[in-house]
Amino acid sequence: EQRLNSLLCLLESYLSAFPSSTNTAESPDISLFDHLKTTAAIGVCISEYLAAEQETQFKKRLFDNEKQFMDEQAFLLYSADFSGIQKFIYTVASDKALRSLRSRSFFLELAMEHYADELLSLCGVGRANLLYTGGGHCYMLLPNTTEVRAAIERWNRRFNDWLSEQFGISLFLAHGYTPCSGNELVDFPAERSPYKKMFRCVSSALAGHCLLYTSPSPRDKRQS
């Protein structure tokens, strides 16, 4: 796994400025690195998905029945987002405030990187499946299997338990995911805007998880 991550770093260093397509009729807006990284992410998701279903007839499933497989929800689009960032960062004493702001921002970035790395490992995939991370937010493409969904819930619960022990209720990591197919990832059919709907579903799942965190419990309501 460490060697794969090192290879990914090397590819990013040397191939980020090269276009994935050399066809002059096409717009060179995607780097060769991004193309390779995304292809690897999709490939490992398909591999894990088929392994979970104990599929052995890969050619038949993926090529002979390509149209059918493209409609299968073999992937999970996953997202996680820190809730309470503004309050956590800016609730500082005026003395040495700038240093405190920087350290807290750095902590959040480090915490998200740790969360993402651990989750990717638990799901049996690598950094290629991390689509984006930054600003206390991340997106991942994961295999849609029972084991992966269980790992997602366990790790998020464990991570939030640790946040609660360290910071009380001031910081929480909301998360959400939605199953998606190959056709949805390539926005087909375009007239139905499946790509937009896919991200809308993830955002709704995130908001729902965050709402559970911010809503008072029955016990809190009785005490108030």
Which ranges hold each PLM region?
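Regulatory and interdomain segments flanking nucleotide-handling catalytic cores
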Residues: 1-219, 224
